[in-house]
A protein has these predicted regions:
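Glycine-rich phosphate/adenylate-binding loop
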Residues: 15-23, 31, 35, 104-423
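Glycine-rich Rossmann-fold phosphate-binding loop(s) that bind the pyrophosphate
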Residues: 27-29, 51
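Glycine-rich phosphate-binding loop and adjoining beta1-alpha1-beta2 segment
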Residues: 49-89
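Hydrophobic residues within alpha-helices
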Residues: 35-36, 80
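Extreme N-terminal leader/targeting segments of oxidoreductases
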Residues: 1-18
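Gly/Ala-rich phosphate-binding loop of Rossmann-like dinucleotide-binding domains
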Residues: 36, 40, 64
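A structured beta-alpha segment of the ubiquitous adenosine-cofactor-binding alpha/beta core
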Residues: 72-126
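Conserved S-adenosyl-L-methionine
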Residues: 41-45
Length: 423
């Protein structure tokens, strides 16, 4: 398919400012599809990430990139990225990633100038805030969060110097943080004592995308008074466009997150380096093999997953099974033996069984099968900050004076995000 050839004399003089700018749109649904089209036509290189699929029931809210009915059943991010290809300027790219935020680490965002959170639950927004704030300021992208509520549209742009994403979330909303939301709060209202999902339109979704695109445009150009502002569009009968300056929330747990003081760099990516290969690089830097690589720690939906499950028991019959997965990526169906899985045997409560303690760290002389696994398959997300511990003779972690901790990251992860299509 031939690309569109734009007449430069009919375009804005500042358009060249956008050509080397990469943007990640997290959530390729109602707002996200509108954003992808706008960003492509602005001359950006927009990537999209979403784990969900397009359905016919939501077709009326998506941007015109999505074709009905042929795109039903396709991954949202891959589909949106595919549809914008003819709109991209020469030299610009777009990649669609079938994934969720749990499989990304901080460094996965470091190659982007802007990250737009067009997601509809607070858990994802809180996790994104954690990941972004773990990046040093010189590699930290500007964040835009947008959404809709009824026919109102809103967008907030922030650089994490005055407040963070968590500051924009009322802690009362976190009681059910997985509920469908927008940036204004839960999209559920009480009607006659019953909860009712608030409905929004394509107009509201496209307006939210337009506000975000305008904030990005003005930020790139360098207009004053753009950064750390909230734009709100209110529809008739109270038509209004307002600007507000959000404030830092007192004792905000998100603002308390800071990047490591120092990061040591390894070559490659978690996608193609084995545990043995990583340990060899770490040993060269530390000058010793006497260290431990902590299993990746994932804190999501108020649960901490920090173990690697080597073996467990079938949660149907109790027979021993090999798992070899990070506990944050284990689903109930993964904990059945082949016989019970084939018979679709019902799962019993985990409390019915005795379990082996998962690994909390990997060591130089560990099991060979684990040593040969790729880091990503061991649970380290793309862009991970990997903690390495040297005990230096300490008997336990109470003897903190002897223990040293070093953070490592891979120098290829920030580029790999533009190549992969599924995590």
């Amino acid at each position: 398919m031939n690309k569109v050839v734009y007449n430069a004399l009919k375009l804005s003089e500042y358009r060249p400012l956008f050509h080397n700018l990469r943007v990640l749109v997290i959530g390729a649904g109602a707002v996200g599809t509108h954003l992808m089209e706008k960003f492509a036509k602005m001359g950006l290189s927009p990537d999209a990430m979403d784990f969900d699929f397009f359905t016919l029931e939501n077709a009326a809210k998506h941007g015109c990139l999505v074709r009905t009915p042929e795109d039903a059943g396709r991954n949202k991010a891959e589909c949106a990225s595919n549809r914008v290809q003819p709109l991209l300027d020469d030299g610009c790219t777009s990649n669609g990633i079938d994934s969720d935020l749990c499989k990304l680490g901080p460094e996965a965002f470091s190659d982007y100038g802007y990250v737009v959170a067009a997601v509809d639950n607070f858990d994802a927004k809180v996790l994104l805030n954690v990941l972004i704030r773990q990046l040093p300021e010189e590699r930290r992208p500007i964040v835009i969060m947008d959404g809709t509520h009824d026919e109102m549209a809103q967008s907030v742009i922030l650089d994490n110097t005055e407040f963070c994403l968590r500051c924009l979330i009322d802690e009362g909303w976190m009681k059910d943080s997985s509920i469908r939301t927008s940036c204004t709060g839960p999209q559920v209202r009480q009607m006659d004592g019953a909860g009712e999902i608030v409905r929004t339109s394509n107009l509201a979704s496209s307006m939210a995308a337009h506000l975000s695109a305008e904030q990005l445009r003005a930020s790139v150009i360098g207009h004053d008074g753009v950064m750390n502002r909230r734009l709100t569009y209110t529809a008739y009968p109270h038509l209004e466009l307002s600007v507000a300056h959000p404030m830092r929330k007192r004792n905000c747990p998100g603002c308390a997150i800071h990047p490591p003081a120092k990061i040591e760099w390894l070559h490659g990516s978690v996608m193609d380096i084995t545990l043995r290969g990583a340990m060899e690089q770490i040993a060269d830097i530390l000058g010793t093999t006497d260290f431990e690589m902590s299993v990746h720690r994932l804190n999501y939906r108020k649960v901490v997953y920090a173990g690697f499950i080597v073996e467990d028991v079938c949660h149907s019959c109790g027979a021993p099974i090999q798992v070899m997965q990070h506990e944050g990526r284990v689903f109930p169906d993964d904990l059945r033996c082949e016989t019970c899985a084939a018979a679709n045997a019902p799962l019993r409560p985990a409390s019915d069984f005795d379990h082996r303690e998962p690994l909390r760290a990997f060591t130089w002389g560990g099991e060979e099968a684990i040593q040969q696994m790729m880091l990503y398959d061991l649970g380290y997300p793309l862009g991970a900050h990997i903690e390495v511990i040297q005990r230096n003779g300490a008997l336990d972690f109470l003897d903190a004076g002897k223990i040293t901790r070093t953070i490592f990251a891979f120098d290829g992860d920030h580029l790999k995000i533009h190549e992969i299509h599924k995590l």
